């Protein structure tokens, strides 16, 4: 079972382009009290919503591995989603094909690799 699943993270934060270019991820984590998913993912987690975060925030509905049975359960009822990959071995197109999902809708799936080298999908909705 993933450490990510058990650390009570309910919100995912994606920094905006200026933060990504500046690369000040440690400062961002300290200033907003968020934790990085891993060193190279540039996605951050928190247990509570973060006001004023410079980027987009999402509420995490489910976290799943690429295990077929787990995926089938996690994606039940989802026909389309916005997919982003960060530090992940598959491209968005490859992942979309594998998940058999159309583009769009209000579901956001972030595919990433944790610090423990575990490949995870974070299934979420935009927060506010």
Where are these regions (language model features)?
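SAM-dependent transferase fold signal centered on methyltransferase-like domains
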Residues: 1-128
């Amino acid at each position: 079972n993933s450490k990510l699943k058990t650390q009570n993270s309910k919100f995912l934060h994606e920094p905006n382009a200026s933060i990504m270019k500046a690369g000040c991820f440690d400062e961002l984590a300290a200033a907003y009290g968020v934790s990085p998913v891993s060193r190279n993912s540039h996605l951050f987690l928190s247990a509570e919503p973060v006001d004023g975060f410079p980027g987009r925030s999402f509420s995490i509905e489910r976290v799943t591995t690429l295990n077929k049975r787990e995926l089938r359960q996690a994606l039940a009822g989802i026909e389309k989603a916005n997919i982003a990959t960060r530090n992940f071995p598959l491209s968005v197109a490859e992942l979309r094909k594998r998940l058999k999902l159309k583009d769009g809708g209000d579901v956001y799936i972030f595919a990433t690799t944790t610090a423990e080298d575990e490949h995870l999908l974070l299934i979420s909705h935009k927060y506010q």
